[in-house]
Amino acid sequence: MGFLTDWLTDWLKSLLIEGILGNLSGLFDTVNARVGEIAGEVGTTPAAWNAGVFSLIRQISETVILPIAGLVLTYVAVYELIQMLIDRNNLHDIDTWMFFKWIFKTAAAILILSNTFNIVNAIFDVSQSVIASSAGVIQGSTDISPDMLADLEATLETMGLGSLLGLWLQSIFIGFTMTALNIVIFVLVYGRMLEIYMLTSLAPIPVATLSNREMGSMGQNYLKSLFAIGFQGLLILLCVGIYAVLIQGIATGGDPIGAIWGAVGYTVLLCFMLFKTGTISKSIFGAH
């Protein structure tokens, strides 16, 4: 009878150990996969992310927003001319070079306005290039191999049946946290891209104010916002890369209970920091 009990206990222990290791290895595989997927999502330019949506945004911008921006630019140019004349002793000191200067500034403003989409795409091309370069470094340094679970398996074999059962239930809970993490990442990444499209659609209006010293703050802040949301992708990738390194430390720690709850804590921390990336990026570039 004792032999049968020992055999049944060993069988249950091996079954639970396989289940725990399977759940944890699935977690680590998910982490590796998410780093690669996020690198692809946040490193994609608006034109490449969804060509149909980008074409729609561009058409709306050029047919609806651009005429309004033309009126704004006309107002800015006239205001600039009047201000320039008044500043010269109320029209008493007028030089012909002033008009050449005004013509040059207006021509430059028209050129910039007519190439608004090229400027916007160039900004996102720069951020995409930086993200693509960083993705190779981050993903290459955070890969979690199955060999890292060997020490953890040895620790599990020394534990009792009750402890293993508790760990198995906890490891299932980890799967739900990863599902929640995937939802958060999906909302953040896709929400960021929709924000980019909305910013892009209204681009001509703030760009039309760039030539004026007093009103140019609108256009300057708009460009800062573009850089901020572009490089937010790098911060998102960096957060996931740090998370992967922390999870890697859990995998090699050899403490199964710590691995379970450490993963939960790191997942909650990652979700919090992902929502902070936008604020951090805007503070870096001075956008508001």
Spans of model-derived segments:
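Alpha-helical transmembrane segments and their helix-start/interface "positive-inside/aromatic belt" motifs
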Residues: M1, L8, L12-N23, D95-I112, ...
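Binding/recognition "hotspot" determinant
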Residues: M1-V72
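Non-cytosolic segments of integral membrane proteins
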Residues: L16, I20, T106-L202, I236, ...
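Internal transmembrane helix-loop-helix hairpins in multi-pass membrane proteins, together
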Residues: A33-I65, L85, N89, A109, ...
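Alpha-helical membrane-interface segments at transmembrane helix boundaries
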Residues: F54-L66, W97, K101-F104, E157, ...
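Juxtamembrane "helix exit" motif at the C-terminal ends of alpha-helical transmembrane segments
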Residues: G70-I86, I236-A251
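Hydrophobic transmembrane alpha-helix segments characteristic of membrane transport
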Residues: V72-A108, L202-G216
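Alpha-helical transmembrane segments
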Residues: V207-K224, A251-G253, K282-G286
